[in-house]
C-alpha cells in the first residue's frame, strides 16, 4: 500500500539543532542539526514504512504573505550561523538518501506540503514541529507533531485534534485569526488571548461568525472585536495554508526506494555518521550484519515489569553482587545486563503495593562503585527523601559525558547514547555508554579530573544543598517595603517629567516618550526599532533629568522582583534557602546555582550588598566567608611564566598600581586612583582578550590611547602575550584548549565562517585555561574544606564564584577560619602564592 511522508524540513532542522547543540565533526564543522534530522528520519522510515517521501524547504525570498503584510515573521531572529552552514549539507544528504526536495520561491514549506497532501489520495503523514499544519488533517492525512526536540512525536488525527478543543481542522485557522501567532507575527485581534479565542469559537463556531455577532458581544471584548475585524480577516488569510501551489510534482517524482543505495551509505560515512548506518537498511551488496557491526553498539532488550516488593527482593537476591544500571524517574528502571530492562512500578494504592520509598530502600544496600547512574546527586536526594543513605559512589555517565565532550550537557538518554556511539533509549544502554566514555576519558587524559575532583564533589554539593542557608525574612520584608516605596516615588517623578502616565517597563512606550515627545536623540537601533537599553540610556544620562530616574527605577525593580521577592518564595519550611548546584551546565567547569541563583546577587552596589544582610547564621553560630584574591591574574602569572608578573605577586605588590606605573610611565608612588582604576580594567580585560576598542569603551577614552595601554602592558609582561597567542594557535590545531587539570573545552567557533563568532572563539581560547583552572581550584578547595571540617560543628554552605561560605559555632570561629584559609591556599601549588581573604559575621553582609 502506498504511504506518503511529507517533511517540514526547516521546522525539523531547527528542532534538531537545539536538541543537539555543539555537535561537530573532526574538522570542527557543525553537524548536530543534520545528525538529529537524519536520526528522526531513520526512525520514521522504520516505523511508518513510507513508499513516497518529499522534503519541503523554505527559501530566503519573500512569500506572498510578506507581500500581503510587511510585518509577517518580522520578529523572528535570524537563523544561527552554525545552522545556516548545515542547510546545504543536509540538502545534499537528503538527495543522496533518495528523497525528493521540493521548494518554490514565493511559497513556504507549509504551502508545498499542503498542496501535496491534498493532491494525492493515499495515506499521508506530515512531520513537523509547526502547529499550522494541523489545519491539513483530513480522512487520509495525519500530522506527526514533534515535541521535546526530536525525541517525542505525537500523532494528530481528527479525534486527537477534537480532544485539544478544535472541532474541525479549519478551526486552527479561525483560532489563529482571533488570537494571532507570535512566532509568525500574525497580529490577530489585539487583546484576545488563548482562552478567550477558544471560548469565542466554542460559542460561535468560526471567526466569521464571531465577527458577524460582534455587536452582540458586550463590554471591552465586543469593542476589541469590532475594532479588530480587518486585522482578524488579514490574520485568517495569513494563517491559511495554500493548497494550490503551482508545482509540477507527481507521485512518481517522490517515490522512495528502500533499502538505501550504496551512495547513501557512503554519504553518511563521509559526514562521520557511521553510527547512523546501523539504523538504515542498504541494498544487498553492502548490507552489514549486526554480528559484524563494530561501528555502533546496538541495544536490544526485553522489558519486565515488577510491581511488588517480593519480586523486587527476588530480583536483587538472584543478582546478588552484580553491578547494575539505575535510572529513577516516575518509575525506577534497573538493568543488570544490556538485554533486559526491569521497570519497577510504584503503587500508591491504599491497600498495598510499593511506594518510591519502598523501592529505593530495597535498592540502596546493593549500590556499589561499579553500578552506573546518570545523575548521582539527584539520586542521593531521592535516597534522602526516602530516608535511606548509601556510601557507594557509582559511575555517573552524565558527569563522564560532560568531561569527555568538553563541557556539553545532555538532556536525555537518546542524545547521550548517540554521542557515545550507542543506539538505545533506556537504562540498558548505560553499560555500553559508560564503557565508551571511560575509554574516551582515559585517551583524553581526564581520569584524574573525574575521579579526584568531579565525582567526589557530587557528595559535597549534595551536603551543601541539604544544609541550605538561613534567611531572615524580616530583612527581606524591610527591603521590599523600602524598594516598593522608592519605585512609587520614582514612578511619580518619571510621569511628571514625561507629562503623562505610561508603562515604564515597555520599551516601545518608553521610546515614544524619550525620542518623540522629549526629543532626545537616539544612538542605537535594534531589530524592532530604537533601543532603550542600559548602554543607550547611560549615554543620555546628562541629556535630561528623566534618564537617571529611569535607570534607578530599573535597578530597584530588578532588585525587588528578582532578589527580594524571588528569595521570599524560595525560603523553605525550615527557614533556609536550598539552592541547587548544576555541575554539568557551563563549558568552563564553573558551578551554576539555580532555584534560586545565589551567584548573581550584585555585590558592587550598596543595594546589592544590602540583600546579603538577609543571609544569616543560626543562633549561636557565625558565617565565615573566604575569597580568593585575583585568582585568574595569579593563574596568568603561573601559566604564562612571565617573570615580571610572578615577581610582582611574590613581592606582594599592588598589581594594579604596578601595572598603572608601567602603562603610564610613572613612579609607583605617583599613581593616582584613576590610573589604578584604569590599570585594573586593563589587567582584567587582558584575561578576557579585550580589544583596544573594547577597552576604550570601558574607560571612555580614545581607541588610540587604549591601544597604547595594551601595547605597554604586553611590553611589561611579554610572556602573557606569548601565552595568549599560543592558546589560540593550539586551539586552531587541536580543536580544544585545556586547564592545568586537563579539563577541555571544544573550540568549534574558530572554524566558523562568521567573523564575530571566530573572534569570540579566540577570546574563549585565551580565557578558558584561566577561568577553567580557577573553577578546578575552587572545587579542589571545596573537597579539602569539607574533609578538614569533619569533626567540627562547621558546614560548607555556599560557593559563589571564588568564594566559599561556611557556618560554624561561635566558639569554633577562629579554628574554622584557619581550616578554611589553609584548605583554600593549599588547594594547589603555583609559582605565585594563592591569597585568601577571610571574614566572619552574623550575616553574609558582615562576613
Where are these predicted regions, by residue range?
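Function-dense linear segments that define catalytic or interfacial modules
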Residues: 335-338, 401-424, 429-430, 583-667
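Conserved catalytic core of nucleic-acid polymerases
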Residues: 466, 578-579, 584-586, 661-792, ...
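Conserved "right-hand" nucleotidyltransferase catalytic core of DNA-directed polymerases
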Residues: 228-352, 423, 429-603, 622, ...
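Short alpha-helix plus adjacent loop in nuclease-associated cores
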Residues: 17-20, 71-85, 139-167, 222-223, ...
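Conserved DEDDh/DEDDy metal-dependent 3′-5′ exonuclease domain
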Residues: 52-54, 105-108, 129, 302-316, ...
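C-terminal polymerase-core module
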Residues: 485-492, 496-547, 715-763, 767, ...
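Extended two-metal-dependent nuclease catalytic cores across DNA- and RNA-processing enzymes
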Residues: 21-24, 74-246
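Non-catalytic, usually N-terminal nucleic-acid engagement modules in DNA/RNA processing proteins
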Residues: 1-54, 58, 65
Amino acid at each position: 500500500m502506498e504511504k506518503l511522508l511529507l517533511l517540514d524540513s526547516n521546522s525539523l532542522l531547527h528542532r534538531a539543532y537545539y536538541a543537539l547543540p555543539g555537535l561537530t565533526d573532526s574538522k570542527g564543522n557543525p553537524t548536530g542539526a543534520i545528525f538529529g534530522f537524519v536520526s528522526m528520519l531513520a526512525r520514521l522510515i522504520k516505523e511508518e514504512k513510507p513508499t513516497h517521501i518529499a522534503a519541503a524547504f523554505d527559501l530566503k525570498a519573500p512569500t506572498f504573505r510578506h507581500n500581503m503584510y510587511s510585518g509577517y515573521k518580522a520578529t523572528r531572529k535570524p537563523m544561527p550561523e552554525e545552522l545556516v552552514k548545515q542547510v546545504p549539507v543536509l540538502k545534499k544528504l537528503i538527495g543522496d538518501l533518495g528523497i525528493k526536495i521540493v521548494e518554490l520561491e514565493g511559497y513556504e514549506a507549509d504551502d508545498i506540503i499542503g498542496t501535496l497532501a491534498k493532491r494525492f489520495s493515499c495515506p499521508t503523514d506530515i512531520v513537523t514541529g509547526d502547529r499550522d499544519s494541523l489545519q491539513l488533517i483530513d480522512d487520509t492525512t495525519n500530522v506527526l507533531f514533534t515535541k521535546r526536540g526530536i525525541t517525542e512525536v505525537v500523532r494528530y488525527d481528527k479525534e486527537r485534534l477534537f480532544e485539544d478543543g478544535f472541532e474541525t481542522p479549519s478551526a486552527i485557522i479561525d483560532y489563529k485569526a482571533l488570537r494571532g501567532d507570535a512566532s509568525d507575527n500574525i497580529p490577530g485581534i489585539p487583546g484576545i488571548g488563548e482562552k478567550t479565542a477558544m471560548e469565542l469559537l466554542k460559542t460561535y463556531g468560526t471567526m466569521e461568525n464571531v465577527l458577524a455577532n460582534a455587536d452582540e458581544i458586550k463590554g471591552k471584548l465586543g469593542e476589541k472585536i469590532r475594532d479588530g475585524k480587518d486585522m482578524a480577516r488579514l490574520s485568517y488569510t495569513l494563517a491559511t495554508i495554500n493548497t494550490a501551489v503551482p508545482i509540477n510534482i507527481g507521485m512518481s517524482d517522490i517515490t522512495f526506494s528502500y533499502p538505501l543505495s550504496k551512495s547513501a551509505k557512503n554519504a553518511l560515512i563521509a559526514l562521520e555518521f557511521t553510527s547512523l548506518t546501523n539504523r538504515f537498511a542498504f541494498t544487498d551488496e553492502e548490507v552489514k550484519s549486526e554480528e559484524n557491526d563494530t561501528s555502533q553498539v546496538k541495544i536490544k532488550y526485553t522489558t519486565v515489569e515488577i510491581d511488588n516488593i517480593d519480586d523486587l527482593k527476588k530480583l536483587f537476591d538472584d543478582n546478588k553482587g552484580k553491578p547494575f544500571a539505575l535510572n529513577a524517574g516516575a518509575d525506577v528502571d534497573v538493568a543488570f545486563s544490556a538485554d533486559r530492562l526491569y521497570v519497577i512500578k510504584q503503587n500508591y494504592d491504599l491497600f498495598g503495593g510499593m511506594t518510591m520509598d519502598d523501592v529505593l530502600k530495597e535498592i540502596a544496600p546493593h549500590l556499589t562503585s561499579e553500578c552506573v547512574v546518570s545523575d548521582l546527586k539527584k539520586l542521593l536526594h531521592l535516597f534522602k527523601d526516602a530516608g535511606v543513605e548509601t556510601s557507594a559512589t557509582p559511575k555517573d555517565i552524565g558527569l563522564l559525558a560532560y568531561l569527555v565532550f568538553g563541557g556539553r550537557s545532555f538532556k536525555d538518554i537518546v542524545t547521550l547514547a548517540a554521542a557515545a556511539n550507542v543506539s538505545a533509549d533506556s537504562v540498558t544502554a548505560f553499560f555500553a555508554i559508560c564503557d565508551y566514555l571511560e575509554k574516551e576519558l582515559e585517551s583524553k587524559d581526564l581520569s584524574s579530573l573525574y575521579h579526584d575532583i568531579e565525582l567526589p564533589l557530587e557528595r559535597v554539593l549534595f551536603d551543601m544543598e541539604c544544609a541550605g542557608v538561613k534567611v531572615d525574612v524580616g530583612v527581606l520584608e524591610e527591603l521590599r517595603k523600602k524598594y516598593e516605596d522608592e519605585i512609587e516615588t520614582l514612578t511619580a517623578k518619571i510621569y511628571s517629567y514625561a507629562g503623562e502616565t505610561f508603562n515604564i517597563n515597555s520599551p516601545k512606550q518608553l521610546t515614544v516618550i524619550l525620542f518623540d515627545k522629549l526629543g532626545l536623540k537616539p544612538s542605537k537601533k535594534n531589530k524592532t526599532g530604537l533601543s532603550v537599553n542600559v548602554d543607550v540610556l547611560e549615554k543620555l544620562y546628562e541629556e535630561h533629568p528623566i534618564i537617571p530616574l529611569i535607570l534607578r527605577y530599573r535597578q530597584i525593580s530588578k532588585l525587588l522582583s528578582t532578589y527580594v521577592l524571588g528569595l521570599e518564595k524560595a525560603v523553605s519550611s525550615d527557614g533556609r534557602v536550598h539552592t541547587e548546584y548544576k555541575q554539568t551546565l557551563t563549558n568552563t567547569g564553573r558551578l551554576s546555582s539555580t532555584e534560586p541563583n545565589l551567584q548573581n546577587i550584585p555585590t558592587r552596589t550598596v543595594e546589592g550588598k544590602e540583600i546579603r544582610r538577609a543571609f544569616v547564621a543560626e543562633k549561636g553560630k557565625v558565617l565565615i566567608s573566604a575569597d580568593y584574591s585575583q585568582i585568574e591574574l595569579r593563574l596568568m602569572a603561573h601559566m604564562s611564566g612571565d617573570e615580571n608578573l610572578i615577581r610582582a605577586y611574590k613581592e606582594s605588590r599592588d598589581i594594579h598600581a604596578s601595572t598603572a606605573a608601567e602603562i603610564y610611565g610613572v613612579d609607583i608612588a605617583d599613581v593616582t586612583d584613576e590610573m589604578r582604576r584604569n590599570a585594573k580594567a586593563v589587567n582584567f580585560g587582558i584575561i578576557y582578550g579585550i580589544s583596544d576598542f573594547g577597552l576604550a569603551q570601558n574607560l571612555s577614552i580614545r581607541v588610540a590611547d587604549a591601544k597604547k595601554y595594551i601595547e605597554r602592558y604586553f611590553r611589561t609582561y611579554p610572556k602573557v602575550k606569548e601565552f595568549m597567542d599560543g592558546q589560540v594557535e593550539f586551539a586552531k590545531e587541536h580543536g580544544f584548549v585545556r586547564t592545568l587539570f586537563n579539563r577541555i573545552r571544544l573550540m568549534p567557533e574558530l572554524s566558523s565562517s562568521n567573523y564575530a563568532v571566530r573572534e569570540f572563539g579566540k577570546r574563549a581560547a585565551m580565557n578558558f585555561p584561566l577561568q577553567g583552572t580557577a573553577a578546578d581550584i575552587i572545587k579542589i578547595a571545596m573537597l579539602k574544606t569539607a574533609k578538614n571540617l569533619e569533626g567540627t560543628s562547621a558546614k560548607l554552605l555556599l560557593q559563589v564564584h571564588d568564594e566559599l561560605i561556611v557556618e560554624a559555632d561561635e566558639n569554633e570561629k577562629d579554628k574554622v577560619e584557619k581550616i578554611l584559609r589553609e584548605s583554600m591556599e593549599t588547594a594547589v601549588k603555583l609559582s605565585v602564592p594563592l591569597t585568601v581573604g577571610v571574614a566572619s559575621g552574623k550575616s553574609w553582609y558582615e562576613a
